[in-house]
């Protein structure tokens, strides 16, 4: 196995279906609203940000989906915040939608892909 850290803007195509956890958070709104039957939940008034247990969806993007690296966030001793943000065009009910979403680094590390030139 070779270490691969992509440049931002790099595109990859999924070579296998990829399952991941989508967390209810504003930056995931476009994909959440597309893949969920309910709108993105809002943190209830009075609950501190760090105590709010955000709802999650377990979803799968299909083989052949193209993802573009938009942001990679990794901080020393802050592993709970490590994440990768993608831009993608997702087909849903026969229509293509442009979305931007982030996933935890652990989920991103499970992607099987090929680089797009």
Which residue stretches match the model-derived regions?
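Intrinsically disordered, low-complexity, charged/polar segments
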Residues: 90-117
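SH3-family beta-barrel domains
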Residues: 1-52, 114-117
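Hydrophobic beta-strand residues in large extracellular and virion-surface proteins
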Residues: 12, 67-69, 86-88, 113
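Conserved beta-strand/loop element in small beta-rich adapter and peptidoglycan-binding domains
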Residues: 52-73
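A short, sequence-level motif marking secondary-structure junctions
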Residues: 27, 71-73, 103-109
């Amino acid at each position: 196995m070779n270490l691969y850290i992509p440049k931002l803007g790099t595109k990859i195509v999924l070579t296998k279906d990829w399952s991941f956890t989508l967390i209810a958070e504003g930056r995931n709104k476009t994909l959440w609203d597309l893949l969920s039957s309910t709108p993105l939940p809002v943190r209830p008034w009075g609950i501190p940000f760090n105590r709010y247990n955000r709802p999650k969806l377990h979803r799968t993007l299909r083989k052949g989906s193209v993802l573009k690296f938009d942001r990679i966030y990794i901080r020393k001793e802050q592993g709970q915040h490590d994440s990768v943000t993608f831009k993608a065009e997702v087909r849903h009910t026969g229509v293509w939608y442009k979305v931007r979403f982030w996933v935890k680094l652990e989920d991103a590390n499970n992607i099987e892909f090929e680089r797009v030139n």
